Regions:
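Surface-exposed substrate-engagement region within the catalytic domains
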Residues: 33, 60-72, 214-403
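Short, glycine/acidic-enriched loop or turn micro-motifs at the edges of active sites
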Residues: 161, 210, 322
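Bacterial N-terminal signal peptides that target proteins for export
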Residues: 2-14
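Hydrophobic faces of well-ordered beta-strands that scaffold small-molecule active sites
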Residues: 41-47, 82-83, 111-113, 153-157, ...
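Cleaved targeting-peptide boundary
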Residues: 32-40
């Protein structure tokens, strides 16, 4: 087959799939008050240009006569997804925003922007980077706000920035003034919320980590300090794999804990005492297991008994881009033919956030969630893009090669240290297209891709 002909056909397939997606998302509108920033039920989310590498992968699949798989990649890329703003100069970023807004206007759709440029981003790990200092960050935020103008957009502000404060990074206190770094982080988030929310149609959500990270009272206090009351709400599960049932319950508790700590009734004993809240890890009413949602009834009961007149009102959104099959569990690698030890399994599970295999795309973006405070399910993480080089050198993989090492796997310690045994290859860098993972996600989508 001629490569150029295949590419032209596939581009038409991508375009047709995108058109079908944008025309099928509209539903009957409902009236919204000007002050209400909750997305209306007829919201149509923006579909960005296909991710770099996706068209090439689909072309390659067609050349191998794998039409079904090529169409799966096309369908994935024709689903609304977030646009990540991860750096560049204020002028360059403003230009990217302006271009995206023009494309979104053409689609009559609402774009989702992820702002990911906080100083000290990702604790210097796989996605390290960010602005040099607060002044540079504030200027970057100003440029984005100015470019947005009066257009409706959704902003997801700085994933991991609140769940992973500088105090969580393990910095050497002789090298980093940790209290100052934490104070700066909160100031940066507060400024960003205030500046972005000045735009009349900008809807801002801030970072709450996920249901298997910070405990409910901890993240609630952090969200309050970060200024969540000035935003529409918070988001969870970005770039993660937790099932939406867990995330929705966790987020509902966080919203409830906020209301609890602001309730002045009964002598004001609740005021500011977010630490009293039960969580996904603890309830005084019974043993709670973060991995067993049936035990979460004890936390539900705690809130039912202690809320008083408080009514949760803080909204949230959930990233469903890769949670169709839930989180990774390495237990099968303890059995033949792998026969990996308990310590290896523990390391693999702890690194389960990093390019886990056999996951799937989750619920496509929608505002029809059935949960009062859950504004939307969104595809925030770009599915198909690598989480990073997930290997033993980075601490997220372990493997006993003396027990299981197929032909073609590396045989030297140096190469094994940068090899991913779960995929049987060397992972692409963070943000690069990972074709094997992309196809795996599409094939295992839940619900299936259309």
């Amino acid at each position: 087959m001629h490569h150029g002909f295949i590419r032209s056909i596939l581009i038409r397939v991508f375009a047709a799939a995108a058109l079908l997606a944008t025309t099928s998302l509209a539903t009957k509108a409902i009236a919204q008050t000007p002050e209400d920033k909750t997305l209306p039920t007829n919201t149509r989310f923006f579909i960005p240009q296909p991710a770099s590498g996706s068209i090439q992968q689909a072309v390659g699949l067609l050349e191998k006569f794998q039409l079904k798989n090529a169409l799966l990649i096309a369908a994935m890329e024709a689903t609304p997804q977030a646009v990540w703003l991860t750096g560049n100069t204020p002028a360059q970023t403003a230009s990217t925003v302006a271009t995206t807004l023009r494309e979104a206007n053409f689609q009559r759709a609402v774009p989702i922007f992820v702002l990911y440029n906080i100083p000290g981003r990702d604790c210097g790990s796989y996605s390290a980077g960010g602005a040099e200092n607060t002044a540079d960050y504030d200027a970057w935020i100003d440029a984005i706000a100015g470019a947005i103008g009066n257009q409706k957009v959704v902003i997801l502000l700085e994933p991991d920035a609140i769940a992973d404060l500088p105090s969580d990074c393990g910095y050497d206190p002789t090298q980093v003034n940790i209290p100052e770094a934490v104070a700066n982080r909160y100031a940066q988030i507060n400024y960003a919320i205030t500046r972005l929310e000045q735009q009349p149609k900008t809807i801002v959500y801030i970072d709450a980590g996920n249901s298997h990270w910070q405990a409910v009272p901890v993240i609630t206090q952090r969200l309050i300090t970060a200024g969540v009351q000035q935003a529409q709400g918070f988001f969870s599960n970005v770039s993660n794999y937790n099932l939406s049932t867990y995330e929705s319950k966790f987020d509902t508790w966080v919203s409830a804990c906020m209301a609890f700590g602001m309730n002045p009734a009964d002598g004001g004993w609740r005021l500011g005492n977010y630490s009293y809240c039960a969580s996904q890890y603890y309830s005084p009413l019974g043993t709670v297991n973060p991995d067993d949602i049936t035990t979460w009834i004890y936390t539900d009961e705690w809130f039912q008994q202690n809320m008083g007149t408080a009514v949760p009102s803080t909204h949230f959104v959930i990233d469903t881009s890769r949670n169709g099959q839930g989180p990774f569990n390495a237990a099968s690698y303890a059995t033949p033919p792998y026969n990996q030890s308990a310590s290896v399994i523990t390391t693999l599970n702890n690194g389960g956030w990093c390019n886990p295999p056999a996951r799937g795309l989750g619920v496509p973006p929608t505002v029809s969630t059935g949960v009062a405070l859950l504004d939307a399910y969104l595809w925030v993480k770009t599915p198909g893009q690598s989480d990073g080089t997930c290997d033993s050198a980075g601490g997220v993989r372990a493997w006993d090669y003396s027990v299981y090492e197929p032909a073609g796997w590396p045989t030297t310690a140096a190469q094994q240290a940068i090899f991913d045994p779960l995929w049987g290859l060397y992972d692409p860098a963070a943000g690069a297209w990972f074709p094997q993972q992309a196809l795996d996600l599409a094939q295992r989508a839940n619900p299936p891709l259309h």
